[in-house]
Amino acid sequence: MITRSRSGERGQTIVLVALSIVSLLAMGALAIDVVTLYTARSEIQRAADAAALAGAKAFVDSGSTSDPNNASLQTLARSMGTAFINAILAENKVGGVPPVLLGTPVYDFTTHPGNPLITITLKRTDLPIFFARIWSRAAPTVTAVARAEAYNASNSQANTGNFIPIAPKCVKPFLVPNLDPNRGGAPYILLPNGAVAPGFSVGEGPTWWHDPCNPGGGSTCGPPIVPPPSPPSTGDYYFPAQVTRNASNLCPSCKGSSDFEQSIECCDFNAYSCGGNVPNASIDLTLTGNTFRQDIHQGLQCLINMPSQDTLDASYFPSGPMQITANSGPQSGKLVSTSSSIVTLPIFDNTTLNTATGQVTVIGFLQAFVWDVNGASGQVQMSILNVVGCGNNPGAGSPVSGGGISPIPVRLVHD
């Protein structure tokens, strides 16, 4: 047998192993870069979505959806929206650094009048990478686009011929008639299409609202009169709604025992339907005596943290936003953008009220700020922030919720 020397091939295995290790390390490093870019892409899209929703909230807070032709409110919405976006960007970092706006937010009040849109583009440059630089020395950049809208059902039927229903939760059990006490009993909502009636002004009040009990005063409140006597010289009446106990309700520690009081204090998860021509709620004709006014007084005191309730300053409005100052909790003494004093109340069609059964048709919602409550008389002092109407021709599809709490939900829009 002939034996050949392989001395020239000695050490090649070590070289191959070394090259393999280097290749594996390079692939691992590239994988890290890919994950970094993928994570940054996800983070910037989340940041863009959050910023767009914050900007859309300005449409609600400014009142521009309730008065869609008011140029001053549109200007205010732009200013508030940009401020909200800049504030939230600092809290939504991409790769450890806040993203920046690419250009300026685009505010669209004309495509769907009364249901405005906002579009923003975010950018994050100079992302940290390692081995990926062998293909390009330029630091990678990620961008994201997000669009959101504030949906006020008042404008839906006028825009499209039918309205997309809303089904808000955490609605307080005070049914208010479609009569604006600040405009001599003119309607809040036009019945044919659910649009907000001309002449309504965002920020009306503060106005005292009265319970509809039989005359007598003090604790001698009997069954509510349906309809009540002529409206008082100032303010109007509210009616107690029938409520259903719900174990899922979110309640504060000060909650009471009755279902009616708890529905005032808690976030009541029983959703209200709105619109159409069929009765969908009822006035509670069984609440009597001192218990009724006690429930109202104690319920609202608990809800708004009396005597340390939040305050509303509308002196800058509409050139500047209404300012809410917290007077309790960790934010006490500071300006806040939300408050437990902001409530949603159902509006009913007083022209179709069934006086025998108390059945009513909810045709919209009021968003109001509660200032005070008088336990002896059942009076509640409120300022009106927004009005939402529902038409009589509901369209197909699921109700718009946007989180389920606000009567004017904000939501992301995807083309």
Q: Can you annotate each of these PLM segments?
A:
Residues 1-82:
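Alpha-helical assembly-interface signal, strongest on the long, hydrophobic N-terminal helix that forms
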Residues 32-33, 129, 137:
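Residue-level signal for pocket-adjacent positions within structured domains
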Residues 121-128:
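Conserved short secondary-structure elements within globular domains
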Residues 54-58, 80-95, 149:
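Structured segments of extracytoplasmic/periplasmic soluble domains
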Residues 66-82, 86, 104-119, 132-415:
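N-linked glycosylation sequons
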Residues 62-67, 92-107:
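Surface-exposed patches in mature extracellular/periplasmic domains of secreted proteins
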Residues 96, 128-129:
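Acidic, polar loop-rich interaction surfaces within structured domains
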